[in-house]
């Protein structure tokens, strides 16, 4: 299982944290509340009125995943605090106070009347049902459901026809935009193109591109057509691209002429017989010189603007997201059209989106966050999405937040750390008064970043947790609730989360009756587990049924992440339960990197881990054992890095390579990455009795 969130516990470096705070005795005020020590935990108290939401009622007609349940059965707002006395903000972890942090007062009040969508968490936990959330969607005749229809056609056929759906900002060219009506027309054209090319319902359409309009049109047009959309990260090297195209059984690929040449797509097509069509975006004359491809814009220009959306069933496959594995090939997580129920609900309840908002999700659409929350969730709510094609630059990002009047900003800790490096004063040069909510996902969000958000933006940063497999946000810090920096938050209404005990082999403890042994005491570490049945839950790994079944036990989905839960129901991340590397929001499987390094004629063995990094979260580090005839020197080290970058792309290739005599393996031949990580970080090596003798 590949987590989309991970975080270090607060107080990883208590001494430096305390010393830092002692040097600045500035009082703390938060926009939504004064800060107080609450039950020996950091608490940001909301001043909002909490009333039950009578519009959402409890239902009993939910239709959770039959497959998941059968598997389980088979397996034994914000208001200012001006005028109030400041209070200290105290952090606590594992019964120890580990530091005091502070933040600047609110600079600007929130516009009057903007209350949170989720006003009372406890009341919503009782009132919420997935059945009611489903009825908030339009649906299709005879119980059908289609993500593309809910995100595009429903809005275009209603009051949002002339509302900008997608606004594209470019570093070099003028900005452009698509209204919901225009998006409906363009996605209908693309669906007609798929028909003309005889792409069948359920067949896979891959898109390899940056943040260009054609990507969004292709994604939504594919969903309207009833075929399956699968995004590819444009920074991938040739091998990860080919591997995913093969595993996914790609029928059609949309990419740019530049990426087609740079990634060697022409060569890999010879090895991909199922890939029948390639549509290229780019200069018409350049495309005309490339054999056996289609010009995307020519085909779109000939296609009709009307299309009857496919009457897909809720459980019909819609999305294929690849997530890296630790001991094998990437896994293709299958998601269905019913996922849109959770996308819309979490957009409302977690991200606090509402019609008319301007929303900026900075995630690349090549990753699941960029699809679920960069495309689907906001569009189902009639929101305007900002899309920027440039890399992070502090002044540019702040100008976007200012000029586009962004209301809700969903970003990653890596970006926030880079902004923090240039200082909060830079943010104060811009009018960011339109912002009412900031959320973060993808990697560790330490407590200081939460507080720094208050200093820089007048708002704290709200962390949340989910995985590729969960398809949507599962645990979050909500706008109306207390914030405990360093915490993942509390489960989404409609989600049952628990902590399961693990044995000495890091496996869940299963009782004689087949149930999981759950941990009830607060503060004790265990594996985070979720009760299956939410709409966006993955329905399988493509072609790997057994691998999917192993994700469930005792009636629960096993996330693979270790957590603890405090007395108030807040979850805190402890450690990963697998070896997947998270670098700048990218999920990297070590096996994939090791395999490429082993193709170099100098390499005998390779083991890869994630090394902590203050900006990227982690960077890829490889330990390489050379063949006897090769000498470990700096030239070879640089050559190996360059070799890996050519094959994997800079986002995946190792940042560091260390030559070693041998790579530790257990007696079954599996690389013991735990030991590599322990040696790198100077941690205890633990039990080494199962290791092969190292040379």
Spans of model-derived segments:
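Structural core segment of the AMP-binding/adenylate-forming
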Residues: 94-110, 116, 220-298, 412
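Conserved pre-ATP/AMP-binding loop-to-beta segment of ANL
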Residues: 162-164, 280, 285, 291-294, ...
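Conserved AMP-binding/adenylate-forming
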Residues: 175-178, 192-236, 363-364, 587
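Conserved AMP-binding A3 loop
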Residues: 176-181, 311, 318-342
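AMP-binding/adenylate-forming catalytic core of the ANL superfamily
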Residues: 239-246, 253-258, 402, 409, ...
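Gly/Ser/Thr-rich phosphate-binding loop
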Residues: 295-297, 406-411, 420-484, 492, ...
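Conserved AMP-binding/adenylation subdomain of ANL enzymes
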Residues: 341-361, 365-408, 421-422
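Conserved ATP/PPi-binding loop(s) of AMP-dependent carboxylate-activating enzymes
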Residues: 491-494, 504-550, 588, 683-685
């Amino acid at each position: 299982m590949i987590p989309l969130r991970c975080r270090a516990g607060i107080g990883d470096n208590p001494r430096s944290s305390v010393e830092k705070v002692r040097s600045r005795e500035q009082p703390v005020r938060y926009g939504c509340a004064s800060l107080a020590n609450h039950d020996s935990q950091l608490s940001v108290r909301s001043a909002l009125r909490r009333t039950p939401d009578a519009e959402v009622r409890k239902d009993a007609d939910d239709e959770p995943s039959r497959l998941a349940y059968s598997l389980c059965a088979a397996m034994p707002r914000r208001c200012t605090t001006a005028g109030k006395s400041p209070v200290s903000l105290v952090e606590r972890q594992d019964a120890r106070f580990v530091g005091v942090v502070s933040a600047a007062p609110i600079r600007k009040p929130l516009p009057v009347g903007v209350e949170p969508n989720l006003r009372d968490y406890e009341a919503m936990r009782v009132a919420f049902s997935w059945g009611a959330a489903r009825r908030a969607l339009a649906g299709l005749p005879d119980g059908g459901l289609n993500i593309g229809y809910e995100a595009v056609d429903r809005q275009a056929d209603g009051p949002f026809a002339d509302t900008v759906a997608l606004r594209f900002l470019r570093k070099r060219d003028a900005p452009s935009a698509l209204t919901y009506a225009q998006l409906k027309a363009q996605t209908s054209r693309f669906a007609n193109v798929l028909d003309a090319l005889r792409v069948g319902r359920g067949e896979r359409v891959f898109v390899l591109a940056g943040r260009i309009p054609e990507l969004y049109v292709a994604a939504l047009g594919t969903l309207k057509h009833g075929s399956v959309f699968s995004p590819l990260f444009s920074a991938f090297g040739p091998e990860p691209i080919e591997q995913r195209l093969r595993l996914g059984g790609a029928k059609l690929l949309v990419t740019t002429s530049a990426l087609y040449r740079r990634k060697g797509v022409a060569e890999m097509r010879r090895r991909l017989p199922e890939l029948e069509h390639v549509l290229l975006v780019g200069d018409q004359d350049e495309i005309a010189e490339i054999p056996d491809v289609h010009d995307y814009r020519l085909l779109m220009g000939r296609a009709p603007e009307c299309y009857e959306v496919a009457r897909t069933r809720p459980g019909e496959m819609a999305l294929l997201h690849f997530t890296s594995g630790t001991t094998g090939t990437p896994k293709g997580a299958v998601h269905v059209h019913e996922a849109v129920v959770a996308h819309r609900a979490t957009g409302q309840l977690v991200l606090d989106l509402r019609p008319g908002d301007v929303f900026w999700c900075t995630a690349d659409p090549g990753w699941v966050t960029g699809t679920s929350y960069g495309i689907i969730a906001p569009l189902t709510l009639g929101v305007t999405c900002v899309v920027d094609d440039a890399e992070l630059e502090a002044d540019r990002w702040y100008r976007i937040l200012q000029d586009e009047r962004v209301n809700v900003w969903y970003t990653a800790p890596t970006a926030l750390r880079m902004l923090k490096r240039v200082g909060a004063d830079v943010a104060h040069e811009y009018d960011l008064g339109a912002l009412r909510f900031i959320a973060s996902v993808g990697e560790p969000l330490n407590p200081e970043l939460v507080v720094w958000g208050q200093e820089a933006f007048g708002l704290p940063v709200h962390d949340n947790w989910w995985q590729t497999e969960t398809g949507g946000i599962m645990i979050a810090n909500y706008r109306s609730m207390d914030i405990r920096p360093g915490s993942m938050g509390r489960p989404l209404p409609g989600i049952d989360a628990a902590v399961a005990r693990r044995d000495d082999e890091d496996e869940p403890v299963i009782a004689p009756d087949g149930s999981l042994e759950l941990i009830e005491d607060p503060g004790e570490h265990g594996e985070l587990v979720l009760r299956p049945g939410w709409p966006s839950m993955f329905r399988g790994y493509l072609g790997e049924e057994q691998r999917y079944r192993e994700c469930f036990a005792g009636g629960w989905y096993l996330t693979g992440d270790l957590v603890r839960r405090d007395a108030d129901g807040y979850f805190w991340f402890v450690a990963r339960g697998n070896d997947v590397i998270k670098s700048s929001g990218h999920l990297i499987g070590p096996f994939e990197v090791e395999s490429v390094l082993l193709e170099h004629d100098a390499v005998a063995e390779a083991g890869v881990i994630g090394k902590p990094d203050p900006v990227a979260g982690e960077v890829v580090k490889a330990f390489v054992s050379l063949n006897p005839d090769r000498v470990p020197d700096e030239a070879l080290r640089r050559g190996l890095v360059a070799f890996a970058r050519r094959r994997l792309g800079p986002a995946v290739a190792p940042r560091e390579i260390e030559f070693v005599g041998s790579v530790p393996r257990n007696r079954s031949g599996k690389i013991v990455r735990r030991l590599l990580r322990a040696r790198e970080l100077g941690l205890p090596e633990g039990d080494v009795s199962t290791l092969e003798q190292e040379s």
